[in-house]
Amino acid sequence: MSQQLYYENIAAGSKIPPLVKQPTTRQLVMWAGASGDYNPIHYDKDFAQSRGLPGVIVHGQLIYSFLGQLMTDWIGEQGSLRKLTCSYKGMNFPGETVTAKGKVIKKYVEDGEHRVECNIWAENPKGEKTASGMAIAIMPARSQR
């Protein structure tokens, strides 16, 4: 992580620096162990194909975690992630790049907290959105230092 980001330095319309991941089949097996999601579509190619899929697919919750990392990397240690939502629009495949992106929609003060609302999404290598959602972050303000 670089320097701490402050509320005053954020503008509506700003892009969040993208987070690029390349999940592997091994990572999917490890994720299954950690999450308890042992659905074979995430590690068994033949099983996935028998269910009409082109092959093994990445867990949706792993994509969700990438979106969470996008936000926590961006807001820094003094920021706090207040809300994170995600809905799945497509599939990601192991070995392919997943790019998490975001854009600031608005910033406001509520209950004394400096909040930033963002649209967030994940893209496959074709630039198609495979997941999208929103996040609200509580940011430190220079005026409160």
Task: State what each model feature region is.
Residues D73-A100:
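Mid-chain, well-packed structural core segment of small domains
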Residues M1-I16, P94-R145:
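HotDog/MaoC-like acyl-thioester-processing domains
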